[in-house]
Amino acid sequence: MSDIHEHKILILDFGSQYTQLIARRIREIGVYCELWAWDVTEAQIREFAPNGIILAGGPESVTAENSPRAPEYVFNAGIPVLGICYGMQTMSEQLGGKVIQGVGEGEFGYAQIEMLTKSALFKDIEDAVNSEGKPLLDVWMSHGDKVSAIPEGFVAVAKTDTCPFAAMANEEKRFYGVQFHPEVTHTRQGMRMLSHFALDICGCAANWKPSSIIEDAIERLKKQIGDDEVILGLSGGVDSSVVAMLLHRAIGKKLTCVFVDNGLLRLNEAAQVMEMFGDHFGLNIIHVDAENRFLDAMKGVADPEAKRKIIGRVFVEIFDEESKKCANAKWLAQGTIYPDVIESAGSATGKAHVIKSHHNVGGLPDDMALGLVEPLRELFKDEVRKIGLELGLPYNMLYRHPFPGPGLGVRVLGEVKKEYCDLLRRADAIFIEELHKADLYNKVSQAFTVFLPVRSVGVMGDGRKYDWVVSLRAVETIDFMTAHWAHLPYDFLGRVSNRIINEVDGISRVVYDISGKPPATIEWE
């Protein structure tokens, strides 16, 4: 078995919104990488022993006092370095070049760079050719400051009309700087540039692939756990499902999964989880039907944050009770993924940008006295999905739209009642079914239905009915930080509305949410 961590790239984070994207791109190329704050020590870099280092972008100005700098060792380690945007600027400044502050002439968005000379980073790459026969590349810029003089030993590799050094290189030392962002899809040949850096310049082998990751994870789990037993909270979501499958492969029946049905899941979801993991894959699952317990705890509570806290508290209570029944369990498995690790790592100086993410599991009792097993802690979400497919989990389950941890608890507005949840489940199932039938499900990023605790008059036959209102919500987004409402066809929306009103007794009106994020959020609560 090849060592999937043998070749690796270190990415230093200076606070760019794109930094995690760089890491994901390097992983997609097949090379392991880690993302650390910019203020790491020489000892930490030596211990990690990377084959190359990428200095990522950042929001600060190299010209400002006390702005972040790469550790000097980065340029003395004898390994290739790629500076991206701010990373190029700090590389230039630290090695004797000059950076000037942008005065109203920064470049933001699409740009075309003209190649001035050949470079290993841009080998055989061009998007077009200008009238002078010079190769042109379509790239994505996002910078105010710019390099005005490059360090000794460097050459200008590319330029734009307003940026004389859009790319620079010291081929002898294998130092490269690009003012644009190769990691974003708008830079058409960005993946090829990153591939040249990781595979050709740094000499990494592409060992980081789903089958190898699974093999490595199973071996490590066997070593860590030995003959002990493990307990896992299985929700049916992507992360816990993939953890369950990895542990099942590694230790078989020594894994006990606790599936808590809180009554806030999607239509037939509890039955589907039990059928898939219990009947089909043969996992050992304790099924706790706790619908009444959750609903009783939320009785009379309308505040969304209070509802979230109650749902979290009751889950912890139940999981604690069930874990005590598994007296032989020595380990607790969690679906922690790499973005969670990045968030909690932070920075030695406190200056580095901290990327926020939602922790998979939190608030479990400190007195559980169990060791922690986190087989996904090196993986991004897209990697978790890929290894889930390799482990035999169905595509439709792994690539479902996001579902909030509190479930329908935050999609029923105000107080949560069983009647409301049942109506919402059925309405939502119709919406999702119709999206699939119209081949629209994978064209939107997230779609769901919200129950509004208001009654509206409707006409059924010769009579009137006074029933509840639901809102359909569908958005398009790249990162869920901002989102546009999806412009679904009117005839499609009409069909969904008619089906819900005719098939779900208790709903008399369907509306469509056309709010973007910002100013609205994607979820209503």
From Swiss-Prot:
Gene3D superfamilies: 3.30.300.10, 3.40.50.880, HUPs. The active site is at C85 (nucleophile), H181, E183. Keywords: ATP-binding, Glutamine amidotransferase, GMP biosynthesis, Ligase, Nucleotide-binding, Purine biosynthesis. The keyword Protein biosynthesis does not apply. It is an enzyme of class 6 (ligase). The keyword Glycoprotein does not apply. It catalyses: XMP + L-glutamine + ATP + H2O = GMP + L-glutamate + AMP + diphosphate + 2 H(+). One of its GO terms (molecular function) is GMP synthase activity. It comes from the Bacteria. Residues 8-207 form the Glutamine amidotransferase type-1 domain. Pfam families: GATase, GMP_synt_C, NAD_synthase. GO terms for cellular component: cytosol. Pathway: Purine metabolism; GMP biosynthesis; GMP from XMP (L-Gln route): step 1/1. Catalyzes the synthesis of GMP from XMP. This is GMP synthase [glutamine-hydrolyzing]. It comes from Shewanella sp. (strain W3-18-1). The gene is guaA.
